[in-house]
A protein has these predicted regions:
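Cytoplasmic-side transmembrane-helix entry/capping segments in multi-pass membrane proteins
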Residues: 2-7, 25-37, 136-141
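Helix-loop-helix hairpins and the membrane-proximal interhelical loops
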Residues: 31-77, 95
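Transmembrane helix-bundle signature of multi-pass membrane transporters/permeases
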Residues: 33-36, 76-82, 94, 107-117, ...
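C-terminal ends of transmembrane helices
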Residues: 12-26, 121-127
Length: 208
């Protein structure tokens, strides 16, 4: 089970951290401890949100995120606060255990998470040279342009076609697949425009 695996990983991490002198093993121990704590936290959260499917206020809040603008904004803000896209996706997966996360809510939140993931990159670029700042901006623009492109395309088509899966209930696996497909599709769409994005970045951060 997940709890057993987390416990084993935590024990190994503690051994590496406390009883092995080499710094490399200590770093691995820190990673393993962090991973096990994350897994336990996700499992605890999953169990806690399951009863909330019958809570009217909880359902109303999640329904609000079906609005694309609200969902995207929530994803951006949440990821900016957590400083981790992986943690944000994990929490969304945990919330899906309540059975109240639909595709209509998961999609805009996932789009927002992609943009919010640029926040720690932008923060880390403060104080770096111009190339460091340009790298951070490329990360931001890739996520931002991808979100804008797919928002316009998907919701424009949905306004005409009315996709039947919009109200489908999402599971943790489906959310992981959605996040992966969205990221891959964004990369494929933006590949032909890499040079244009580069030009925009150089206009923002000039050589002079």
């Amino acid at each position: 089970s997940t709890a057993t695996i987390s416990a084993i990983v935590a024990i190994i991490g503690i051994i590496f951290k406390m009883f092995v002198k080499k710094s490399g093993f200590k770093n691995v121990g820190d990673i393993m401890l962090g991973f096990s704590i994350l897994m336990v936290g996700m499992q605890t959260m999953s169990g806690a949100v399951a009863p909330l499917k019958d809570n009217e206020h909880f359902v109303n809040v999640l329904t609000m995120f079906k609005n694309p603008a609200a969902g995207i904004l929530a994803g951006i803000l949440f990821t900016a606060v957590l400083q981790s896209a992986s943690a944000s996706v994990g929490i969304l997966q945990a919330l899906s255990m309540s059975g109240t996360i639909t595709f209509a809510a998961a999609l805009p939140i996932t789009m927002g998470i992609g943009v919010g993931a640029a926040c720690p990159v932008l923060l880390s670029s403060i104080g770096t040279n111009k190339n460091g700042k340009r790298t951070a901006l490329i990360y931001l623009f890739n996520d931002l342009f991808g979100m804008l492109f797919w928002s316009i395309v998907f919701y424009s088509v949905n306004a005409v076609v009315h996709f039947p899966f919009m109200n489908a209930t999402m599971s943790p696996v489906l959310i992981a697949m959605l996040n992966t497909v969205f990221r891959a599709a964004t990369i494929l769409v933006l590949l032909p425009f890499i040079k244009w994005i580069e030009k925009i970045v150089y206009l923002v951060v000039k050589d002079s």
